[in-house]
A protein has these predicted regions:
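Iron-sulfur cluster-binding electron-transfer modules in prokaryotic oxidoreductases
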Residues: 1-160
């Protein structure tokens, strides 16, 4: 494959559409049909999805797409009503923005992140920056939704 810049000049609609992972998977589910019903199930309760703020605003159905995918595999997923994690790309890494970054995290994500280790294993976060921010302020790295799906399908128990 070629880099998108090599095949598209930006002046017209490109001959391709880049999709988010969950967009692609949600569209592929009907093709999988009954084959997903026989897969192993995770029984530890519903998983908590903390969505990447930019992704949620650019693709407003992204959280519901994840929920649809997880349900197809017999897993319950609860998208959390949160705002920005406070990382905001490089902004949150800059020393002069630490207090503001922490404040944004505490106003939203910090109030919803569970305190005990068992509940934290159910926390999923889409964005790399979001997972970094949770590690920074809550002391653990949440799994990406695809990691949780893989773990459930393989019968693995996530590490504490």
């Amino acid at each position: 494959g070629q880099d998108a810049h090599a095949v598209h000049d930006g002046k017209a609609t490109p001959p391709f559409r880049i999709q988010l992972l969950q967009e692609y998977l949600a569209k592929k589910l009907p093709e999988l049909g009954a084959s997903v019903s026989a897969l192993p199930r995770e029984t530890a309760g519903s998983l908590l999805l903390f969505g990447h703020c930019t992704e949620r605003t650019e693709e407003v159905t992204s959280q519901e797409q994840w929920r649809t995918i997880f349900r197809a595999f017999g897993l319950e997923l609860e998208p959390q009503a949160t705002g920005c994690c406070g990382m905001c790309g490089v902004y949150g890494h800059e020393a002069e923005h630490y207090d503001e970054s922490r404040g944004v995290f505490d106003m939203s994500w910090g109030k919803r992140i569970p305190g005990d280790a068992a509940a934290r294993r159910r926390v999923l976060a889409q964005g790399h920056s979001c997972r970094s921010q949770v590690k920074r302020f809550s002391g653990f790295v949440p799994r990406h939704p695809m990691e949780a799906l893989r773990d459930a399908l393989e019968g693995a128990t996530p590490a504490e």
